[in-house]
């Protein structure tokens, strides 16, 4: 359940997270392990 940097296909903005992800991962803007636009965590 950790966070990791995503590729260019997975991005999120500070105003909208999750649904804007183009990859099979969900963006976690609240994650502080990386930039808000490149911090993702698996849905599971």
From Swiss-Prot:
GO biological process per UniProt: cellular detoxification of metal ion; response to copper ion; response to metal ion
Keyword annotations of the record: Cadmium, Copper, Metal-binding, Zinc
GO molecular function: metal ion binding
Known role: This protein binds cations of several transition elements. Thought to be involved in metal ion homeostasis.
Recorded family membership: Belongs to the metallothionein superfamily. Type 5 family.
Free-text domain note: All cysteine residues are arranged in C-X-C groups. These are thought to be the metal-binding sites in other metallothioneins.
Protein name: Metallothionein-4
Organism: Drosophila melanogaster (Fruit fly)
Origin organism lineage: Eukaryota, Metazoa, Ecdysozoa, Arthropoda, Hexapoda
